[in-house]
């Protein structure tokens, strides 16, 4: 190989890397671009309580709501339409296997204990490493269960009781596998 070809290859590589780094530095130096990028990502990854209420009210079939809390907490009370995948007691491999069984043509929405619980974010991050993408409800069980009207303006005197059920998961929705304590949790 001639010196000319080696130099041309190095120059091409340098220009490519330079453009890539330059573009990144340009974006990082422009607050409006950072803000736009942040909100685009945020909106792609979250679902509001009002949207969930609308889906339940309209009996929408374009989504699956996944309750990440423990099986016992799910059986005590959970939102209508929710299936239970108790992420806090699963390894990443088990979690991926469970979510891989969910319909690919539906929006998958996860929720955990509260808005301050990071379980939903941990699950979303782990699944994204395996090409599975979910959205997170912007508030958790505690906020919606006890302050439904606060998170659903215009709901009137609705206290959310019409959206809460008890009992075991419908086995036709999503299988629940027994597991040992794993790596996920608040």
Regions found by a protein language model. Name each.
Residues 88-91, 115-116:
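Short beta->alpha connector loops
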Residues 99, 149-153:
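Short low-complexity, flexible loop/linker segments enriched in glycine and/or proline
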Residues 71-88, 101-103, 107-110:
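Mid-length scaffold segments of soluble, non-membrane domains
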Residues 96-145:
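Catalytic cysteine-centered active loop of the rhodanese-like fold, especially the PTP/DSP P-loop
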Residues 56, 60, 78, 106, ...:
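Sec/Tat-exported extracytoplasmic proteins
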Residues 46, 65, 82-84, 134-136:
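Conserved beta-strand scaffold positions in the cores of enzyme catalytic domains, especially
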